[in-house]
Amino acid sequence: MVETIFPGIRVRRVTTPRLTANVLEREADAAADAVRTVVFVHGNVSSSLFWQPMMLDLPGDMRAIAVDLRGFGDSEPLPVDASRGVRDFSDDVASVIHELDLGAVHLVGWSMGGGVVMQLLLDRPELVASLTLQSTVSPFGFGGTAVDGSLLAPDAAGTGGGGANPDFVARLASGDRSDEPGSPRAVYRSSYVAPGFVSEHEDVWVESMLSTRTGVDNYPGDATTSDSWPGFAPGTRGVLNTMAPTVFDTSGIVGVEPKPPLLWIHGSQDAIVGDASFFDLNQLGKAAIIPGWPGDEVAPPQQMLVQTRAVLDRYAAAGGAVTELELENCGHSPHLEKPAEFRTALLELLGA
């Protein structure tokens, strides 16, 4: 059996009016008089476990907390209402912040978690002291949009729950710990980190991935049929549908006042979030992996980085302080792959 909790980390159950959440914190923080609190929010097919090395590496005058989103880790596997975008997740995180009486916190969101913390900034700006977006989903969701964020098809065909690989979902559900092609371990090695990166904690990261609850109410969610290529559109339930561009748009952070300082950190070899992501159905079509692709004029791959940079440029033009850091030889997980650079950038943002 894999020991998933690192020495110096303790597990806490936090019951709010919305859910019972699983929370990780540093043992030393229990009695500490923290000047700042950092709240880490994981991404899709992961959990708070991934944040442990960075939590332990933060200075002692900070409080470090990582929250499991519903349906991940050991938080309640409550259904996800995707008609609200990621608000089920962001409202859950806000409820934990409120229950722990943390006040304004420094939010760090990874991948889908970046979308969650952007949504939290939109809905509860008083809770956000700063915002760190690591390998974040675009402010216009995942897939199905032109560069300006407009929908390529009215129903956002090719996005949402129908885009998941059924074999991968089945392997998650069965607890597959092998390194076979398509297994969670293989996906971690090929997509979560850059080629050649090796972690002594890989078994823990695989356990984290395997904590993902599967099904139409959780991961990946449901789907509907579409007359547009590739024949499906988002449903209204489950994780992948929360990031469908029909329901997800956090570009409104440009109008938030006051604007907290913002850090966007990402790897140059990110296989999941990029301008030619092979997790984007349109990119798979362009590469002839999915047949029948109607072409760039109808279904171009999403320019995720271009979109994010454009929104953050507007955020800066409207008075916000924005720092972008792209790390070379780094994939989707800078906090694991380039921890020193990540830590330095985060502490600079926090003024520590």
Which role fits each region the language model picked out?
Residues 57, 61, 103-149:
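Conserved hydrolase catalytic core segment
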